[in-house]
Amino acid sequence: MSWLKEVIGTEKAVIAMCHLRALPGDPSFDAQLGMNWVIDKAWDDLMALQNGGVDAVMFSNEFSLPYLTKVRPETTAAMARIIGQLMSDIRIPFGVNVLWDPVASFDLAMATGAKFIREIFTGAYASDFGVWDTNVGETIRHQHRIGAGEVKTLFNIVPEAAVYLGNRDICSIAKSTVFNNHPDALCVSGLTAGTRTDSALLKRVKETVPDTVVLANTGVCLENVEEQLSIADGCVTATTFKKDGVFANFVDQARVSQFMEKVHHIRR
């Protein structure tokens, strides 16, 4: 039995993303609509996800495009306010993801009581955001310095819109990441949000680290969820839950329910 059962309540867990709209300081933030509108839309999406039956939810600043690798304090503060106002209505385990800043994610997790975070913790990359370097040693020390040792860590080892600097095979990356960092899970992704995770790649990673939770991190949908969950220990998904399966849209509860009905059938 993996920690998914203990923390989320089931194996083959479905972690649904609650994508927060652009926040103060983001280029797309609408100051006329303001934070109350962002909170209202987050509540709508949260309700649709929970009522549709997902196992857990993860809040992320998905519309803070283009992303920073070290976020400004107003981003974390805005996310803390949103989650704080939603707290009384959160009925399932939740995590947070401050894109793309693992230190800020730990800070937000401690402020809100989140059970897990997902981030790019390791590696150096050429990315759409410039040369992207990480400092996992300092990040994990920060985790323990602030008392966040119980927060589960989901290591994304195939970062979106980026390529590893250096010719390293994904299996080598998976193996050394597990050895050096003891992650609670590895996330395997496609190129961008909503892009399908390659099943062959997912299989190679899971076979390399069979004792570590491996999650399909992008592009899981009604058509491929059975195949993906036959390999992975669970999935993180968002786009397929949105109206017409379009990233920019809001969550459609009917799509969530249909997806989860299939997942329950797979779990039997």
UniProtKB/Swiss-Prot annotation:
It comes from the Bacteria. Belongs to the BtpA family. It holds the Pfam family BtpA. It comes from Escherichia coli (strain K12). This is Putative sgc region protein SgcQ. The gene is sgcQ. SUPFAM superfamilies: Ribulose-phoshate binding barrel (SSF51366). InterPro entries: BtpA, RibuloseP-bd_barrel.
